[in-house]
């Protein structure tokens, strides 16, 4: 079948604008006169078709759950929601953002793919009435009434929870003095909360499809927000021994009960039962293999429970964001408070160490003068009051917020997770009931979805860990508060504060556990871990230390008698020195053991501390038996060696047991007092307590738990995996063969569209069974084009079958061509601009002025190749093709064509006639780079000049056919303009205009096809006046 091309004005009111950036993607809104533009730098611009600015934003700084901000991501695809309220923007990093069209704010973000998303497609679900499906259950069901009632109940079950999430931080702003959300966090939470009403009106009953450009996958997002299913194209084709060559387009249709995608494959010739719309047979249609273009339909069951699941997924991500922001706020304010607490114990000098001061004060009741001065004046009563204030005011506030804000967020996550799993289980039961009528008669109850799905199990475990860590954080706050309270009580009773000690101080001392306070001071105020270990061994492990020392002495053959003799000789030498110094007798008993200790060790080659483990580390040869009393030789330092630089100054103390909860791993201080989970009920809780008590989970910080939970939340499509984590096999409901000829090698472009889009609600096709939800497949090669309509057999009533087949045949197109020359429409020929030999109509007696207009602009009037197809509604098409000119060296030009009428055609011949735009305003043609068509008001927009300019024009709803039925336009002659000029002079009194100048202007206007403006009066009246 051939088609023809006429040249006429199909694009009116063309306006060209310069874009603020190079456009990478664009789309029209189906409900408004809006156009959205995206750039490679992440900018999105929304304008009216009149080019009035609405808003501009950048989505690179918006992150989804489980992702980071990527400054180098570009906007790869755009698509408006069916009602035009939201704009879906996909990035090159696989993130989909939903933007509010009215405000330009990002309302929802989800990680949908691993790499670049190449295309988006957002459709409405158009279901048949429920009563029309009852006949399916009347053949093989034992109890029809029970099944019908069960299905009706499943269809009409109300949502069990429609409450809105209360903002916890709003209450904290009123009565919380320490921790508050920032304004940016508050705004982020408010704008990302999608209300139930908004969800019902705009997102429910919609399916958003996205293609992963790298992995050849289709991601199905229920309600545009919930990545419910992932269709692996390669795995799906592998079921039929096909390999993917090219993926063209995708489309969701509720009439076919699934997601359709169009692809060119290579493999056996399938026996497609496309008339019945059933899966192909096991045996191939013929021997051998070849290249085929096939339409695959993957089954997707839709139920009301699935929409509730999508709403629960939104609530789940909102709860995650609320917890993350609450944790960040709590962490930031906690760090400020703990720094203030530690600053109270800073002595500001290295000579006085608060740990040594407190330890000496506890053991001996006194310390040196500098230490007492710090306790009395540096810390003082004000310092103790601040510590007590922190322990009695700030710590309870932290506990309250941790238990209130964080615990509320954690419990909300647990609740939303439970509701999410419940809605999924309800949906799974519906599918099982729909596919298997023996469900009601099984003796064994079916396994819950959460028990058989590894993704749901992981989600439950991560949220439970987060809830447990939140509870532990509150317990750690209480523990720290008690420790600081005991510390303040003890310090207040030390010597520097004895003057203010009250009478009941002794009673307080009796109630205090001195051993625990001593251990607390050693572990928190001594920064060196080796020193802490040494002191703990001396104070609390003396028996063990003595036993080890005795054992070591036996192994080293330590001679105690020889050691005592040596001590005596050293003492004698020192005694003689003292006698010589004071010239008087000196009693040996007056010598203090502490004075002898350094002298004793000075005589030894290897000084030994009898209270440490150093004696146990000596060699077998005992140094105590050596008689050499000389000083040990010191190793000379090599000149090239530099002294080791001193490390960072260690903090005076570390009292924080809570701060590590905000990190990825808990500190040793937090683990020391970390409580254990009760394992009493593990028999009914699937050993939850024992899992929580494992070392790996105990060491986890909340930040790491959040990262793991984010990774789980960002991959809900794994819900279709089995227990082993492998993707379940998807069911292909039918395969439709488009082309399978021996010479076929694929198409240049292919599109799937609805014959009657959802916004054409009053079209007659909606009243005809089968045609209202039919789809159209349009494919083209360089020199071929075809378009077919596929009707869902389940929608066609027997009495309408012949009528439907007649409509399908009339909508079918199939063209082949080599070259097609463009013809001029008759109506356009009457109004065409004058050419070189026919510039204007003149009287025989009038003088003609020839004006040189320069080189003639080439006209591209020969179609040599097709490149793109844009299906509209009811058989209308817009094609993008490459045209050549008769002039040499002009190359090719990409131009658009449009079918001149839609179905049903008033004139049958108009079906195969396309119109190419003719510029009546004299403007030159521009090569089209990217073309989009408005689906309702049929505006056209195309990019040119490397995406830096955009042209928008109005397309006529229907181009006049070739037959001339419009009134012929009367063109003015040169004499008419001369008469108008004379009358203008008489009326205005202007006589200085050059006649030649005016004649040149008239000639240029007529050559360009334009009429000069006048005062609206006709020239016939002017002639009558002259007579």
Curated annotation (Swiss-Prot):
Gene3D superfamilies: YVTN repeat-like/Quinoprotein amine dehydrogenase. Pathway: Protein modification; protein ubiquitination. Keywords: Cell cycle, Cell division, Developmental protein, Meiosis, Mitosis, Neurotransmitter transport, Repeat, Transport, Ubl conjugation pathway, WD repeat. It comes from the Eukaryota. One of its GO terms (cellular component) is nuclear periphery. It holds the Pfam family ANAPC4_WD40. One of its GO terms (biological process) is regulation of mitotic cell cycle. WD repeats lie at residues 18-65, 70-109. SUPFAM superfamilies: WD40 repeat-like. Residues 625-647, 1014-1027 have a biased composition (Acidic residues). Residues 619-655, 1005-1027 are annotated as: Disordered. Belongs to the APC4 family. The APC/C is probably composed of at least 12 subunits: apc-2, apc-10, apc-11, cdc-26, emb-1, emb-27, emb-30, mat-1, mat-2, mat-3, such-1 and gfi-3. The C-terminus is specifically required for completion of oocyte meiotic divisions. Probable component of the anaphase promoting complex/cyclosome (APC/C), a cell cycle-regulated E3 ubiquitin ligase that controls progression through mitosis and the G1 phase of the cell cycle. The APC/C complex acts by mediating ubiquitination and subsequent degradation of target proteins. Developmental role in early embryogenesis and the metaphase to anaphase transition in oocyte and spermatocyte meiosis and mitosis in somatic and germ cells. Required for embryonic anterior-posterior axis formation. Negatively regulates ify-1 protein levels during meiosis I. This is Abnormal embryogenesis protein 30. It comes from Caenorhabditis elegans. The lineage of its organism: Eukaryota, Metazoa, Ecdysozoa, Nematoda, Chromadorea. The gene is emb-30.
């Amino acid at each position: 079948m051939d088609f023809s091309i006429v040249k006429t004005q199909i694009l009116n009111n063309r306006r060209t604008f310069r874009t603020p950036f190079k456009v990478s993607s664009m789309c029209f809104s189906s409900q408004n006169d809006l156009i959205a533009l995206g750039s490679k730098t992440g900018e999105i611009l929304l304008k009216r078709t009149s080019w009035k600015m609405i808003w501009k934003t950048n989505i690179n700084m918006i992150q989804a759950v489980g992702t980071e901000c990527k400054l180098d991501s570009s906007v790869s695809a755009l698509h408006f929601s069916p009602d035009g309220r939201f704009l879906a923007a996909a990035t090159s990093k696989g993130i989909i953002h939903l933007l509010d069209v009215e405000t330009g704010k990002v309302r929802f973000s989800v990680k949908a793919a691993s790499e670049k998303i190449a295309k988006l497609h957002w459709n409405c679900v158009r279901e048949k009435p429920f009563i029309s499906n009852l006949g399916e259950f009347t053949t093989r069901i034992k109890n029809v009434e029970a099944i019908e009632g069960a299905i009706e109940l499943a269809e009409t079950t109300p949502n069990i929870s429609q409450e809105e999430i209360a903002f916890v931080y709003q209450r904290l702003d009123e009565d919380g003095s320490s921790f508050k959300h920032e304004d940016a966090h508050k705004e982020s939470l408010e704008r990302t909360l999608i209300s139930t009403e908004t969800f019902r009106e705009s997102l429910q009953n919609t399916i958003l499809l996205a293609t992963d450009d790298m992995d050849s996958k289709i991601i199905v997002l229920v309600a545009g927000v919930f990545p419910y299913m992932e269709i692996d194209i390669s795995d799906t084709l592998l079921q039929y021994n096909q390999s993917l060559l090219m993926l063209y387009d995708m489309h969701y249709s509720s009439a076919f009960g699934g997601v359709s995608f169009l692809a060119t494959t290579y493999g056996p010739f399938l026996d497609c039962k496309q008339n019945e719309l059933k899966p192909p047979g096991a045996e191939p249609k013929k021997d051998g293999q070849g290249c085929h273009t096939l339409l695959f339909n993957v089954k997707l069951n839709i139920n009301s429970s699935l929409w509730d699941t999508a709403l629960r997924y939104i609530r789940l991500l909102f709860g995650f964001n609320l917890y993350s922001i609450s944790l960040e706020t709590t962490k930031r304010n906690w760090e400020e408070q703990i720094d203030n607490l530690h600053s109270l114990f800073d002595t500001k000098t290295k000579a006085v160490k608060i740990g040594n001061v407190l330890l000496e004060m506890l053991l001996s009741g006194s310390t040196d003068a500098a230490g007492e001065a710090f306790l009395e004046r540096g810390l003082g009563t004000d310092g103790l009051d601040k510590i007590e204030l922190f322990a009695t005011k700030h710590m309870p506030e932290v506990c309250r917020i941790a238990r209130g804000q964080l615990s509320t967020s954690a419990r909300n996550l647990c609740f939303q997770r439970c509701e999410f799993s419940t809605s999924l289980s309800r949906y799974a039961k519906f599918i099982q009931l729909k596919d298997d009528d023996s469900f009601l008669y099984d003796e064994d109850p079916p396994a819950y979805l959460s028990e058989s799905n590894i993704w749901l199990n992981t989600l439950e475990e991560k949220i439970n860990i987060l809830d447990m860590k939140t509870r532990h954080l509150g317990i750690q706050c209480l523990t720290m508060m008690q420790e600081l309270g005991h510390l303040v009580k003890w310090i207040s009773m030390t010597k520097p504060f004895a003057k203010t000690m009250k009478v009941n101080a002794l009673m307080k001392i009796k109630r205090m556990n001195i051993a625990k306070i001593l251990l607390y001071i050693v572990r928190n105020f001594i920064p060196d871990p080796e020193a802490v270990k040494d002191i703990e061994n001396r104070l609390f492990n003396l028996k063990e230390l003595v036993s080890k020392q005795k054992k070591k002495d036996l192994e080293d053959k330590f001679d105690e008698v020889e050691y005592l003799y040596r001590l005596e000789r050293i003492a004698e030498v020192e005694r003689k020195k003292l006698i010589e110094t004071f010239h008087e007798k000196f009693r040996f008993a007056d010598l203090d053991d502490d004075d002898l200790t350094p002298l004793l060790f000075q005589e030894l080659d290897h000084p030994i501390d009898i209270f440490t483990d150093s004696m146990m580390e000596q060699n077998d040869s005992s140094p105590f038996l050596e008689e050499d009393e000389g000083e040990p030789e010191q190793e000379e330092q090599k000149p090239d060696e530099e002294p080791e630089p001193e490390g960072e100054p260690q903090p005076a103390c570390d009292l924080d047991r809570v701060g590590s909860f905000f990190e990825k791993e808990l500190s040793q201080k937090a683990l020391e007092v970390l409580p254990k989970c009760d394992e009493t009920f593990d028999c009914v809780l699937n050993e939850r307590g024992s899992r929580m008590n494992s070392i790996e989970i105990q060491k986890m910080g909340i930040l790491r738990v959040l990262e793991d939970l984010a990774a789980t939340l960002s991959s809900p499509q794994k819900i279709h995996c089995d227990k082993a984590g492998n993707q379940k096999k998807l069911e292909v409901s039918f395969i439709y063969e488009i082309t399978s000829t021996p010479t076929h090698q694929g198409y240049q472009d292919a599109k799937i569209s609805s014959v009657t889009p959802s916004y054409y609600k009053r079209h007659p096709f909606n009243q005809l069974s089968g045609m209202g939800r039919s789809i159209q497949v349009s494919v083209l090669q360089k020199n071929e084009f075809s378009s077919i309509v596929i009707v869902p057999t389940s929608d066609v009533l027997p009495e309408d079958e012949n009528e439907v087949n007649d409509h399908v045949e009339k909508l079918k197109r199939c063209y082949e061509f080599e070259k097609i020359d463009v013809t001029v429409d008759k109506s356009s020929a009457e109004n065409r601009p004058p050419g070189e030999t026919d510039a204007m109509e003149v009287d025989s007696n009038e003088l003609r002025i020839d004006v040189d207009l320069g080189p003639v602009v080439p006209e591209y009037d020969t179609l040599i190749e097709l490149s793109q197809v844009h299906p509209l509604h009811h058989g209308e098409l817009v094609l993008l093709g490459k045209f050549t000119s008769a002039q040499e060296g002009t190359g090719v030009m990409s131009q658009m064509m449009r079918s001149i009428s839609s179905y049903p055609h008033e004139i049958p011949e108009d079906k195969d006639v396309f119109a190419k735009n003719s510029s009546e305003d004299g403007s030159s043609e521009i090569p089209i780079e990217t073309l989009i068509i408005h689906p309702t008001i049929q505006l056209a927009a195309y990019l040119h000049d490397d995406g830096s300019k955009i042209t928008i024009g109005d397309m006529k709803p229907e181009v006049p056919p070739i037959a001339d039925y419009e009134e012929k336009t009367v063109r003015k002659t040169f004499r008419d303009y001369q008469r108008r000029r004379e009358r203008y002079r008489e009326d205005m009194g202007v006589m200085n205009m050059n006649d030649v100048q005016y004649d040149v202007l008239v000639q240029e206007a007529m050559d360009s096809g334009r009429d000069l403006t006048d005062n609206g009066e006709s020239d016939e009246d002017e002639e009558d006046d002259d007579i």
